Curated annotation (Swiss-Prot):
The keyword Ribosomal protein applies. It comes from the Bacteria. This is Large ribosomal subunit protein uL13. This protein is one of the early assembly proteins of the 50S ribosomal subunit, although it is not seen to bind rRNA by itself. It is important during the early stages of 50S assembly. CDD domains: Ribosomal_L13. GO terms for molecular function: mRNA binding; structural constituent of ribosome. It comes from Pectobacterium carotovorum subsp. carotovorum (strain PC1). GO terms for cellular component: cytosolic large ribosomal subunit. Keywords: Ribonucleoprotein, Ribosomal protein. Belongs to the universal ribosomal protein uL13 family.
Length: 142
């Protein structure tokens, strides 16, 4: 019997919607990354994108434990000399709440073209509204 290898054109991708309200950031991100990779499926193949599409709602209400709300710092560099910028978790939630979940999940995905393709299937929204109703997403309880 030969080993099964999933083909990109035969992979069935479902759409799921997840409510991040009150969920712990890291625990939510690990499950999202696992489902974006497709590791929950029997036909998982490491070099093929077998994951599903995931819509995350209420990104502004995600929880962190301890004092990370004030202590966790996000860094980025503008590319110019002395251009290192930083923002706390609280500032990130106030400015761009979607980015917090995106950064957490992106760090858990593979680096390279396959990881970028997986990351494109993640749709994060700060509120309860999304524009993917035509895809008929199923509610996923994490």
């Amino acid at each position: 019997m030969k080993t099964f290898t999933a083909k990109p054109e035969t992979v069935k991708r479902d759409w799921y919607v997840v409510d991040a309200n009150g969920k712990t950031l890291g625990r939510l991100a690990t499950e999202l990354a696992r489902r974006l990779r497709g590791k929950h499926k029997a036909e998982y193949t490491p070099h093929v994108d077998t994951g599903d599409y995931i819509i995350v709602l209420n990104a502004d209400k995600v929880a962190v434990t301890g004092n990370k709300r004030n202590d966790k710092i996000y860094y980025h560099h503008t590319g110019h000399i002395g251009g290192i910028k930083q923002a706390t978790f609280e500032e990130m939630i106030a400015r761009r709440p979607e980015r917090v979940i995106e950064i957490a999940v992106k760090g858990m995905l593979p680096k390279g073209p396959l990881g970028r393709a997986m990351f494109r299937k993640l749709k994060v929204y700060a509120g309860t509204e999304h524009n993917h109703a035509a895809q008929q997403p199923q509610v996923l309880d994490i």
